Amino acid sequence: MIDQNFWQGKRVFLTGHTGFKGSWMALWLNSLGAIVKGYALSPPTDPSLFNEAKIDSIIDSQIGDIRDLELFKRSLTDFNPDILIHMAAQPLVRSSYANPVETYETNVMGTVNVLESARACKNL
């Protein structure tokens, strides 16, 4: 069971909010009363759930790349979240075969950047 009071007013920083699962997470968190900031690449498909649900109108949405440590760290620390949910990734197996370096940079080093940036947040 979900304690809806837990999420009410919580500052949640969500990576990957333009993807399918991240979009659903943004909608869910918003419905529970969280203050959500999303950070992700532009929506990966057209149409996308992100655009169709107009998620950028209900949360603070920033288009950016987790591989850019300085931009990501500034965005995260400026928001000063209570909770960080990391959903940004390159999830496609075929794409990983075609672009293994980009997949590694995003999924491994991007996650390192998220964790390194989180260390600078006093509320996390």
Where are these regions (language model features)?
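N-terminal Rossmann-like NAD(P)+-binding domain of SDR-like oxidoreductases, especially those catalyzing
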Residues: 1-124
